[in-house]
């Protein structure tokens, strides 16, 4: 289990609150949604979330993503 995320990283995350983001997970899943909030462990809440598959999109709605499963968070196009 990884420790808390550094303060500069947490401050950078503020720029993405209330904007669409794409989250890539260790499992290979990709989830797109509006970043609502996060904590020091990078646990994040996404609004209007969708799981993006190879050939399909699954609507998830309000979703909690555990920080230890996150590989990268990028702005969604």
From Swiss-Prot:
An MF annotation (GO) of this entry: RNA binding
Q: Which SUPFAM superfamilies match?
A: Sm-like ribonucleoproteins
Q: Which Pfam families match?
A: LSM
Per UniProt, the keywords (alphabetical) are: Ribonucleoprotein
GO terms under cellular component:
ribonucleoprotein complex
Q: Which InterPro entries match?
A: Lsm7/SmG-like, LSM_dom_sf, Sm, Sm_dom_euk/arc, snRNP_Sm-like_arc
Q: Which residues form a coiled coil?
A: none
Domain Sm: start-end pairs: 8-77
The similarity comment for this entry is: Belongs to the snRNP Sm proteins family.
Protein name per the record: Putative snRNP Sm-like protein
